[in-house]
């Protein structure tokens, strides 16, 4: 790797937003590299069946979709590097990205590091993803039509998931460790009126019951300590997400949950730096919205680079 080489665009994160940026940038003739810690796709690659991404009438698994996105971007000249980002200096005109494989310099940076769902931390939880354990009701809810599902959580995301699932599943059981929801009151009132939703207050999920897939959960009462088992077909964990932004330090504006503050134009508080996908502040976190962000970031980056070049030219009086 040549540390004196200056890329037009460095993309940190190889999810759908990152590789869409790579595709658009490479097709525009920009010297582009994607730096990904593990494998292409991010959280998407862990999804065993995606039915809500246009163009695949029979659905597609996340790993295959990620592979297609990566190959398409690389076909037009984008490069991929597998490395962990340790530090970034984004303040100058040239941005510096320090990784486990060396230092990369770029004129612009797209941050596409995503957000990971918070897990319960139970034995076999990871292994049962796609086999009864899920973290996204809008992604996986349709697989539980006329089934019994448990939703863990008490905030707005849990309530939203429960409301959506109540229109699909036979029964929805909300398990919350307190005796009241933290969600907005209007959502709370709506759920209370929904016939196929029931609540297990002051309870936590302490164990997953399974064979080849999830068959139930063991609950523990936080007041009495009593335990009991609920039979269910699915468990939706809705206890929040953690954006991957710790490596940024204090140099870029984050909201109180750690998400990068960026609007629909993907611009951050630092000129020439853009945030796409689940890592930025947004209302809807889906593959299609991440893809849209990726295209927008390249559009804004091109405008930024054109303006930077124009401002660097000497003024020649008439």
What are these regions (language model features)?
Residues 7-76, 159-185, 255:
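Beta1-alpha1 glycine-rich phosphate/pyrophosphate-binding loop at the start
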Residues 15-16, 39, 115-117, 155-157, ...:
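Residue-level detector of alpha-helix initiation sites
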Residues 5, 73-92, 96-98, 104, ...:
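A Rossmann-like FAD-binding core segment of flavoenzymes
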Residues 3-6, 142-148:
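Short helix-loop-beta connector
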Residues 121, 127-143, 239-289, 293-296, ...:
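FAD-site-proximal beta/loop scaffold in flavoenzymes
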Residues 80-142:
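Glycine/small-residue-rich loop that forms an oxyanion/phosphate-binding "nest" at active or ligand-binding sites
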Residues 14, 113-114, 239-240:
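Glycine-rich, N-terminal phosphate-binding loop of Rossmann-like dinucleotide-binding domains
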């Amino acid at each position: 790797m040549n540390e004196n080489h200056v890329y037009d665009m460095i993309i940190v994160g190889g999810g759908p937003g990152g590789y869409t940026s790579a595709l658009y940038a490479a097709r525009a003739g920009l010297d582009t590299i994607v730096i990904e810690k593990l494998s292409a796709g991010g959280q998407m690659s862990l999804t065993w069946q995606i039915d809500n991404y246009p163009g695949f009438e029979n659905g597609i698994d996340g790993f295959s979709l990620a592979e297609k996105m990566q190959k398409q971007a690389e076909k037009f000249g984008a490069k991929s590097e597998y490395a962990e980002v340790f530090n970034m200096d984004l303040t100058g005109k040239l941005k510096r990205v320090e990784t486990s494989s060396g230092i990369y310099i770029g004129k612009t940076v797209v941050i596409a590091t995503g957000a990971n769902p918070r897990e319960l931390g139970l034995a076999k939880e990871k292994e049962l993803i796609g086999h009864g354990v899920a973290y996204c009701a809008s992604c996986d809810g349709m697989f539980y039509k006329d089934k019994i599902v448990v939703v863990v959580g008490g905030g707005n995301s849990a309530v939203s998931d429960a409301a959506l699932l109540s229109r699909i599943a036979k029964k929805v059981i909300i398990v919350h460790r307190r005796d009241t929801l933290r969600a907005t009151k209007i959502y709370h009132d709506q759920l209370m009126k929904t016939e196929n939703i029931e609540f297990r207050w002051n309870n936590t999920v302490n164990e997953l019951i399974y064979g080849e897939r999830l068959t139930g959960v063991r609950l523990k009462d936080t007041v009495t300590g009593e335990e009991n088992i609920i039979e269910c077909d699915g468990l939706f964990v809705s206890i929040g997400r953690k954006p991957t932004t710790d490596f940024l330090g204090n140099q870029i504006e984050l909201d109180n949950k750690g998400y990068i503050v960026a609007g629909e134009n993907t611009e951050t508080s630092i000129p020439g730096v853009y945030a796409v996908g689940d890592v930025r502040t947004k209302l809807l976190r889906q593959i299609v919205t991440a893809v849209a962000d990726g295209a927008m970031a390249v559009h804004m980056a091109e405008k930024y680079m054109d303006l930077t070049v124009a401002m660097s030219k000497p003024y020649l009086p008439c």
